[in-house]
């Protein structure tokens, strides 16, 4: 696992530990890597205590080689920004089997003139960059401009990211971070096998869901001590996989959420733990869109200066009092039957009906899932599916 992927995984669970407190019994979906990238772009211009807090919360202090370049135009953290640039260009390169759009942008009020050195370094490493807008006298126009940029960047899937009250004349800087994902499975689910089935949120409460079904060989970990199974579903390119962490019992998710962390996940999904098995898999069709204001989460993790008058962002603008007013994360992901290889047509229906001897992986109650970039083990998405 490379150093950025480790940093990303640690940050992923820090965020999850905060999110699960604020989103009890709800679906959760976020992209730790894109949040980290957007914050790295801010970190480029952070100085003093603000920089120290960010370095700690983002786990940049654990990256080997970080801080080794001191003569660079873009500061001592150039090594870290280069790692992000390499990983992001690898993951988002044009690919016929999945669509992944990560969009990060800093919107700064025009009264804080952005330093040309910062602009040039932000452009060097990050695609989104910085845009100056007029929050003070045209806040509503700025909000609409940001929303239309987000909609365009996410293929029209994320609309109205910023609600009408979120921007006002006191806003100084907003960081926007959105991600859209649609993947194609290595092996397709047959649409004819998809059925409406109950999805149990609790022992007493259930909702109908369109449940996809397939018989095939998958990597599976059976973990009796954790009362859980983990299934790996590969996407077509082989570069990405979805891993589903399914508790044995309907009410078993809380137990997993209490114990999960970076080291545990690495242990549970290691090659020693997972083995190829013929399985009968049931997985809900999912379309998840989530929007989060990350300000309170990041402050709870220890990044307090950035969102207050104590912020030192003199690497972005020499004008005093520049701070982040809002940090907004929008994410859209769709999971359906599409794949590159058919599972067989009429034969597969027969298989589904007459496969009682196969071990089942039936995701018909709350579970955790994540999408992994296999070459580096980076976690792209992390989520909880609680309810259809």
Swiss-Prot record:
- What does the entry's PTM section describe? N-glycosylated on at least two Asn residues by ovomucoid type carbohydrate units.
GO terms assigned for molecular function: serine-type endopeptidase inhibitor activity
Instruction: Give the matching CDD domains.
Output: serpinB14_OVA
Question: Glycoprotein: is it a keyword of this entry?
Answer: yes
Q: What keywords would UniProt list here? A: Disulfide bond, Glycoprotein, Proteoglycan, Secreted
Could you tell me in which tissues this protein is expressed? Major protein of egg white. Expressed in the magnum of the oviduct (at protein level).
Q: Which sites does the entry annotate for glycosylation? A: 95, 215, 293, 312
Q: Which GO terms describe its cellular component?
A: extracellular region; extracellular space
Induction comment = Down-regulated by dietary stress. Decreased expression at day 14 in the magnum of the oviduct in the corticosterone-fed laying hens.
Compartments where located? Secreted
> What InterPro entries is this protein classified in?
Serpin_CS, Serpin_dom, Serpin_fam, Serpin_sf, Serpin_sf_1, Serpin_sf_2
Disulfide bridge partners, by residue number = 74-121
| Family the entry assigns | Belongs to the serpin family. Ov-serpin subfamily.
Q: What is the designated name of this protein?
A: Ovalbumin-related protein Y
Its encoding gene is what? SERPINB14B
């Amino acid at each position: 696992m490379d150093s950025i992927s480790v940093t990303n995984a640690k940050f992923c669970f820090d965020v999850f530990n905060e999110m699960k407190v604020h989103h009890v019994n709800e679906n959760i979906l976020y992209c730790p890597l894109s949040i980290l990238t957007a914050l790295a772009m801010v970190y480029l211009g952070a100085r003093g205590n603000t920089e120290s807090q960010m370095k700690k919360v983002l786990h940049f202090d654990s990256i080997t080689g970080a801080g080794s370049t001191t003569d660079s135009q873009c500061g001592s953290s150039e090594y870290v920004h280069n790692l992000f640039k390499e990983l992001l260009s690898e993951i988002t390169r044009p690919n016929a089997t999945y669509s992944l759009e990560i969009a990060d942008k800093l919107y700064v009020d025009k009264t804080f003139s952005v330093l040309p050195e910062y602009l040039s370094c932000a452009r060097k490493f990050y695609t989104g960059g910085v845009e100056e807008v007029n929050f003070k006298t045209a806040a509503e126009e700025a909000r609409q401009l940001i929303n239309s940029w987000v909609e365009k960047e996410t293929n029209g899937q994320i609309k109205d990211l910023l609600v009408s009250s979120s921007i006002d004349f006191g806003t100084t800087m907003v960081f926007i971070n959105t991600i859209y994902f649609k993947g194609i499975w290595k092996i397709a689910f047959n649409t004819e096998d998809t059925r409406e089935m109950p999805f149990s949120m609790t022992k007493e409460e259930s909702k109908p869901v369109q449940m996809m079904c397939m018989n095939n060989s998958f990597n599976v970990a059976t973990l009796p001590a954790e009362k859980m199974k983990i299934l790996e579903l590969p996407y077509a390119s082989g570069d990405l996989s979805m891993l589903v962490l399914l508790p044995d019992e309907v009410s078993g998710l809380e137990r997993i959420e209490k114990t999960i962390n970076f080291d545990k996940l690495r242990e549970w999904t290691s090659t020693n733990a997972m083995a190829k098995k013929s399985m009968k898999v049931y997985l809900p069709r999912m379309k998840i869109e989530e929007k989060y204001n990350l300000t309170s989460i990041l402050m709870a993790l220890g990044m307090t200066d950035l969102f207050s008058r104590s912020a030192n962002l003199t690497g972005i603008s020499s004008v005093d009092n520049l701070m982040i007013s809002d940090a907004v994360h929008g994410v859209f992901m769709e999971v359906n039957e599409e794949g590159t290889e058919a599972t067989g047509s009429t034969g597969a229906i027969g298989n589904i009906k007459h496969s009682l001897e196969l071990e089942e992986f039936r995701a018909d109650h709350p579970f955790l899932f994540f999408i992994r970039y296999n070459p580096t083990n980076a976690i792209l998405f992390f989520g909880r599916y609680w309810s259809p």
